[in-house]
């Protein structure tokens, strides 16, 4: 792996308290590293360290394999980077002048400035707005100009700090799609901070989860969202049903787990007597009428429960079902209507033995690792 940026044993202290503790983090050349976490997790602090804007209290930062010397002038290194933020922060000038500004500071000749600024405005779909005053642009148009202004510099690293959070959903989705295409086509090394899981999935080659100033997991998006390494990560990435039970049987890689008197089959090699913690995502469940006890599917688990809450979740409905413990499932509005789902009504919940993701498994009675 060719790392552009690396942190080793990096700590930031404020008022005697550690607000950032990163044992190791690398940013690989050409990748988009998405950093997600709740507000106050330390994401922006981490971004400022990676961008060489703030010096850590402890630890080292490497850029292109060299240890950053904080006593030396850092402007030459910072000029190899670019940023875009939640607010576009455009100058009171035309869209073209805003994109051209950094090139003028670098002393490029006018023909080169015209060519590069025009090229990037066009790539972000705002070439026709080149002569518009920035103050007359919509939020989405202004953010496209801000991103063009950053990428026109051809930075070695692009930093994005919540660049979509102030946009409405249709505008945000369109810009995420367009930016993702550009970053992939040009292999732009990018560190992208967001609290939106769907944005991390759409853009990230890898995703880092931050909480309380620490990075808890770094992984490919599909693996992180399907296989979080802890309960805290699982809850943050949307694993809404987390259950704990005792293994009461095992056969051919399928453990029978007792949870609040219910038997659940889980694809894992935990041995009888062990306690496991596992999670299920809302989309793992299939809902059916109580009469459909013999569902024509490969699901090995069928639980009868009562709907305690049914509420909208975007284009779908989110159903909270009490099966002796609570499960959260997603269902289409059409399915809910055809099944006659309503709060207080009964429903059959089905899911495969491969759906549960084991978050923790205790040792068995012989002390063997599960």
What are these regions (language model features)?
Residues 111-129, 180-181:
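Conserved ABC ATPase "signature" region
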Residues 51:
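Helix-to-loop junction immediately C-terminal to a conserved catalytic motif
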Residues 261-311, 330-370:
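Glycine/charge-rich catalytic "coupling/switch" loops of P-loop NTPases
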Residues 36-38:
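The feature captures the beta-strand-to-loop junction immediately N-terminal to the Walker
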Residues 133-137, 141:
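Conserved ABC ATPase signature
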Residues 67-82, 105, 224, 228:
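ABC ATPase NBD coupling module
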Residues 152-156:
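A short, proline-enriched helix->beta-strand linker immediately N-terminal to the Walker B motif
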């Amino acid at each position: 792996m060719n790392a552009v940026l690396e942190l080793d044993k990096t700590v930031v202290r404020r008022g005697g308290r550690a607000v950032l503790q990163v044992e190791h983090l690398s940013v690989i050349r050409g990748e988009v590293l998405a950093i997600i976490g709740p507000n106050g997790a330390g994401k922006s602090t981490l971004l400022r360290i990676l961008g060489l804007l703030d010096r850590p209290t402890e630890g080292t930062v490497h850029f292109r394999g060299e240890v950053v010397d904080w006593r030396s002038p850092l402007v030459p290194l910072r000029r190899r980077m670019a940023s875009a933020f939640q607010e576009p922060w455009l100058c009171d000038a035309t869209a073209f002048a805003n994109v051209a500004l950094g090139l003028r500071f670098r002393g490029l000749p006018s023909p080169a400035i015209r060519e590069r600024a025009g090229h990037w405005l066009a790539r972000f779909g705002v070439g026709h707005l080149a002569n518009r005053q920035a103050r007359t642009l919509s939020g989405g148009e202004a953010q496209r100009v801000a991103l063009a202004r950053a990428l026109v510099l051809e930075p070695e690293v692009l930093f994005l700090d919540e660049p979509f959070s102030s946009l409405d959903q249709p505008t945000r989705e369109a810009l995420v799609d367009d930016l993702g295409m550009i970053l992939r086509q040009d292999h732009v090394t990018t560190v992208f901070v967001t609290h939106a899981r769907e944005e991390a999935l759409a853009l990230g080659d890898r995703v880092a989860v931050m909480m309380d100033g620490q990075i808890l997991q770094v992984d490919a998006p599909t693996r992180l969202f399907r296989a979080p390494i802890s309960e805290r990560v699982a809850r943050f990435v949307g694993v809404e049903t987390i259950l704990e039970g005792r293994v009461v049987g095992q056969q051919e890689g399928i453990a029978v787990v007792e949870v609040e008197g219910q038997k659940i089959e889980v694809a894992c090699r935990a041995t009888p007597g062990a306690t496991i913690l596992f999670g299920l995502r809302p989309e793992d469940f299939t809902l059916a009428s109580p009469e459909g006890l013999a569902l024509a599917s490969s699901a090995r688990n069928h639980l009868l429960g009562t709907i305690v809450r049914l509420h909208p979740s975007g284009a779908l409905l989110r159903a909270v079902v009490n099966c002796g413990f609570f499960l959260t499932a997603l269902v289409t509005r059409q399915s809910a209507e055809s099944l006659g789902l309503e709060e207080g009504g009964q429903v059959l919940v089905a899911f495969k033995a491969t759906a549960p993701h084991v978050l923790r498994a205790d040792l068995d009675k012989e002390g063997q690792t599960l």
